[in-house]
């Protein structure tokens, strides 16, 4: 059973944006500033709820969550993250709906989704079951407890995506590259560097995956590579610098947690990435590439060219503008003409609201959400924003699989032309005959 999904949440009213828990509760409030210290670097088993204060399901869970936290006190840690306020932390763990509950066991980098009931008793049972399994794993030697990757600089498996640079390799890799580089200058004996290492290593893997290698994380042993250390004025450890082609390096002054580093890297990627492609659905390859190779894809169905003429370009301009605005999300963007992909429209229930129409598809889960507001920059922006926060309702794609796509020629960019009617030759028609017919 999957965790509470994007489409199973129906939080339909808002409350003041205040947390559901207080310091007097046994539930530990978690934020980006303390999450790594409290959870990731802990040997304890953690149950963490990602919630939004306005969510009705979260409000109903609150007393049960508090009850479980009290029962499990000093046995299992029970925490909560306001994911509406701390979106970077929710995004880091793929939170798309509220509440989402995750169990952080031996491997804190791979939490498990909680699949049980929402009562205090069910939560306690699940926690004790997970704790029992953790102890068994430790007894059998399969787990050493805390495993966030703190194996030291010599263990390449813990930092496989961190690129080690030297005086000899730095210029070719960094200065001659079109990619963005975040480079840590460290000293092996430095305690702060050792604390940063697992965060840097884990962030490197996430950044590589999310930016397709366009932002790279690297490390330089400044005690050995003193040419580089002197060139960039390294006086303390760790020092992190950001290198972008054609620009002077700048110091990274953000937080030292994985989420902080990933967030900054994605901002750099967004600033430097070109706008996403907006492709017309002309065959199955185009549709599946944009939907199956991206976490989500946005599909617009525009009116027939004979119904809009030059207005089609206005619609496309709106889509391009919003694709650029949301490029950090790395969604796929598609459009088609009304009636051109009838099976796709049927599978998404498009057409009932008229055209233009829009749907957002999660091809992995075969779920979609429809735009029910205005097809305008403001209306679409609000739709996409609600989706980002997990507030929009979704439904299964009709048929349970990606619909068949009809191959067609791409739009040539010109206005449509009405079919020309054949001229009728009236030379053989006798007017006298017409007058008789009228009589």
Curated annotation (Swiss-Prot):
Uppermost EC category: isomerase
Subcellular locations according to the entry: Endoplasmic reticulum lumen; Cell membrane; Melanosome
Site positions for Lowers pKa of C-terminal Cys of second active site, renumbered to this chain? 256
User: Which parts of the sequence form the motif Prevents secretion from ER?
Assistant: 436-439
Tissue expression profile of the protein: Expressed most abundantly in lung and kidney, followed by heart, liver and brain.
According to the UniProt entry, where is the signal peptide?
Answer: 1-19
Q: What is its EC number?
A: 5.3.4.1
Where exactly is the site Lowers pKa of C-terminal Cys of first active site? 118
Q: Any idea what job this protein has?
A: May function as a chaperone that inhibits aggregation of misfolded proteins. Negatively regulates the unfolded protein response (UPR) through binding to UPR sensors such as ERN1, which in turn inactivates ERN1 signaling. May also regulate the UPR via the EIF2AK3 UPR sensor. Plays a role in platelet aggregation and activation by agonists such as convulxin, collagen and thrombin.
Protein name according to UniProt:
Protein disulfide-isomerase A6
Which gene specifies this protein's sequence?
Answer: PDIA6
